[in-house]
Amino acid sequence: WGNKTRLVWTTFTPQQVDIDTDSDQGWGYLMSILDQLGASHVSSIRLDAVGYGAKEARTSCFMIPKTFRLIERIKEEGAKRGLETLIEVHSYYKKQIDIASKVDRVYDFALPPLLLHSIFSGSVDALEHWINVRPNNAVTVLDTHDGIGVIDIGSDQLDRSLKGLVPDPDVDRLVETIHANTQGESREATGAAASNLDLYQVNSTYYSALGCNDQHYLATRAVQFFLPGIPQVYYVGAMAGANDMELLKRTNVGRDINRHYYTAQEVEENLKRPVVQALNALCAFRNTLPAFDGTFSYQRDGEVLTLAW
């Protein structure tokens, strides 16, 4: 533009140009958005992929100290306008804990793969450790519009000496078990097999990752709902949806395996399924029982965890 060829930074795709938050124009643009949201009585903002928001030469430009300062700055400006700040970032688990102390809420992205690990391995060691250290100011999820983030439980991608919640060989076994449970469907949608922006996510619906086992699916949802935080259920998860291979083949976008377009008739049919009815009952239980405003505790007996309020 301006009759000149200029370089722009696009972390993800050419359709998403990064904002220079160091410039007056870039920062002013962000503040104008916060002004408009505050004036519209919005209660919270979600900073998507904010881990890539700060740039500094000779660094990874991901979750560097400058990123934390940017997050704190946006959080402070949001608070002035009555906005809570929710952070979306897939990263090494200790960085998630650090971020949580600086903002209003974070996503608990470690929980989905940890629950799969517990189901597949029969061990609750890693899950129990996470329960003891995880931030309580979390939005809990099992599934989102993206894949299952195994990066959130593994060792630090930039420093392998920093161990994860689950040893890397066990993370590899977790991924292979998901591929086996989906009869290879998730393998077709993950990594270099399809057009993926993130090679550290396994693309599959959560229900399919569990081999479409109703009991396992409801058990993982129950744990999600019983842990401190605000539970969020993705629309495909609300339908206990299986992988959409037709959409994947049509678009060759890995994440589309978990982005089925439901017709009204399909929704009506799915609402009659016992697993979906049980999930809806569980949602109502979580939303209406006053006990969840109390104090959380848990007990362990062998490989059994009992969560209580």
Residue ranges and their predicted role:
Residues W1-W309:
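Active-site and adjacent substrate-binding regions of carbohydrate-active enzymes
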